């Protein structure tokens, strides 16, 4: 079958209109290849068909810069959506939105390629059992448990440790569960993407991860599709290799933002706050593919940027409806030197429920939150009148809350260079046992410092013993 070839008739920014012979129009979402006749060494420009305008013209979104395109240039229909290489060959590599390597390590020799657009798994294929995914991070496992095949939002400003938590999870899932991670860099800083690559290389977790980048400097077409490229990679590991996969998206807001940038160029009427009218549909098509099936699961952690801290903005508000939980990082906690700087009172998880995690886990988690909340309420009194004015009961609450607060800190494997302390993976039962002991007053004789930057409660007891011996 001869290639279906059209000609460019108009270029407006990232949007390219192509005219095809009558009766040979490419399907919507098909990829078109445009060769640059002036530079035969340059890779083809890939465009994705977005609309049929009539008169045999299709409107497409370019996945790369459109400089140098002229009317009359040929565009060939590939007959299928954008295809990306998947499988073991993609691990340890950086790809762009169309599956081309950008790490200068040569071609990706994958046996199989998958389209980036696929239907979400059927209802009958989905796994209805709710399971907890152990991350080995105490504060997460105890208070904000991750559901297998769920979606968690990671909220935090600049410099409070979002990327370090993401890297530690990639490390723990790879080392403890032998799991694969896929990282989608959507519209974020190229420098951060470069840093993440080198840090993961140094931490030895790169060979268990595939990185797909479409950063800030890319045109909106690439940023609006790079999350789908990453999802196609993750789906292969779930459906074919039967793996539990972690999918990291940094940042999900940029996916929506890119959609709104091309929406106006496609001639759609904007909706609230200038976003695309298809905001809910676009996000739903992505999020519904992230789920547990009978073969494996994709658990997603998505960093969410909240524009102007307005949680009612349509982009974060639409994202919230898909999330199973929120992990909020707090600058106040980071200032105390407690890392991971997770806010135990602001963060929530749908599966912190006695029917899912068990009565003991649920009871300990809620008691920890109660003690920390009481401490927060007492802080104003302490600041004005000092500790001496508190009742004996309140003094005990404050002492235990401060121990709990410090015990929520933990040395990370990927942060060994900063902390000088070897990283620790803490099993869920050890986490529950430790916090239960603090709540029951079993460790009231230990100093607050004994609980800081340790793994399990045994490490705190060792610290105490060492101090006693001195």
Swiss-Prot record:
Organism: Nitratidesulfovibrio vulgaris (strain ATCC 29579 / DSM 644 / CCUG 34227 / NCIMB 8303 / VKM B-1760 / Hildenborough) (Desulfovibrio vulgaris)
Keyword terms: ATP synthesis, ATP-binding, Cell inner membrane, Cell membrane, CF(1), Hydrogen ion transport, Ion transport, Membrane, Nucleotide-binding, Translocase, Transport
Positions annotated to bind ATP: 156-163
Alphabetized InterPro entries for the sequence: AAA+_ATPase (IPR003593), ATP-synt_VA_C (IPR055190), ATP_synth_F1_bsu (IPR005722), ATPase_a/bsu_AS (IPR020003), ATPase_alpha/beta_chains (IPR050053), ATPase_F1/V1/A1_a/bsu_N (IPR004100), ATPase_F1/V1/A1_a/bsu_N_sf (IPR036121), ATPase_F1/V1/A1_a/bsu_nucl-bd (IPR000194)
Record's keyword annotation contains ATP-binding: yes
Signal peptide residues on this chain, from the entry's feature table: none
Short name of one Pfam family: ATP-synt_ab_N
Protein's recorded name: ATP synthase subunit beta
Catalytic reaction equation(s): ATP + H2O + 4 H(+)(in) = ADP + phosphate + 5 H(+)(out)
The encoding gene: atpD
């Amino acid at each position: 079958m001869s290639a279906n070839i059209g000609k460019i008739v108009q270029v407006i920014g990232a949007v390219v209109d192509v005219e095809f012979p009558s009766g040979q129009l490419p399907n919507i979402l098909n990829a078109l290849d445009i060769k640059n006749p002036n530079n035969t060494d340059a890779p083809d420009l890939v465009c994705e068909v977005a609309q049929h305008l009539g008169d045999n013209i299709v409107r497409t979104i370019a996945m790369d810069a459109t400089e140098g395109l002229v009317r009359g240039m040929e565009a060939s229909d590939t007959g299928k959506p954008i295809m990306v290489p998947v499988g073991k060959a993609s691990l340890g590599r950086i790809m762009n939105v169309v599956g081309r390597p950008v790490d200068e390590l040569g071609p990706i020799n994958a046996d199989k390629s998958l389209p980036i657009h696929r239907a979400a798994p059927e209802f009958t294929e989905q796994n209805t059992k709710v399971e907890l995914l152990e991350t080995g991070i105490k504060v997460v496992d105890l208070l904000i448990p991750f559901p297998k095949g769920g979606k968690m939002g990671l909220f935090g400003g600049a410099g409070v440790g979002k990327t370090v938590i993401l890297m530690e999870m990639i490390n723990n899932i790879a080392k403890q569960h032998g799991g694969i991670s896929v990282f989608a860099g959507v519209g974020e800083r190229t420098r951060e993407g470069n840093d993440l690559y080198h840090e993961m290389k140094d931490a030895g977790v790169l060979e268990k991860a595939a990185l797909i980048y479409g950063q800030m400097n890319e045109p909106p077409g690439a940023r609006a599709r790079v999350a789908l490229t990453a999802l196609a990679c993750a789906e292969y590991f779930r459906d074919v290799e039967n793996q539990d996969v972690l999918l990291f998206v940094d940042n999900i807001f940029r996916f929506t933002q890119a959609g709104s940038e091309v929406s106006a160029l496609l001639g759609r009427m904007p909706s609230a706050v200038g976003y695309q009218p298809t905001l809910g549909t676009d996000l739903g098509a992505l999020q519904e593919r992230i789920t547990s099936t009978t073969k494996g699961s994709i658990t997603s952690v998505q960093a969410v940027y909240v524009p102007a801290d307005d949680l009612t903005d349509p982009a974060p508000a639409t994202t919230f409806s898909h999330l199973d939980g929120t992990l909020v990082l707090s600058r106040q906690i980071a200032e105390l030197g407690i890392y991971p700087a997770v806010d135990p009172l602001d963060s929530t998880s749908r599966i912190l429920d006695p029917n899912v995690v068990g009565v003991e886990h649920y009871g300990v988690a809620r008691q920890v939150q109660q003690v920390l909340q009481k401490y927060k309420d007492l802080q104003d009194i302490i600041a004005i009148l000092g500790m001496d004015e508190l009742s004996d009961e309140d003094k005990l609450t404050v002492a235990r809350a401060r121990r709990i607060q410090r015990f929520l800190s933990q040395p990370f494997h990927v942060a060994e260079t900063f902390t000088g302390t070897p990283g620790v993976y803490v099993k869920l039962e050890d986490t529950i046992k430790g916090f239960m002991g603090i709540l029951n007053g079993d460790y009231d004789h230990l100093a607050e410092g004994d609980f800081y930057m340790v793994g399990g409660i045994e490490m705190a007891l060792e610290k105490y013993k060492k101090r006693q011996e001195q």
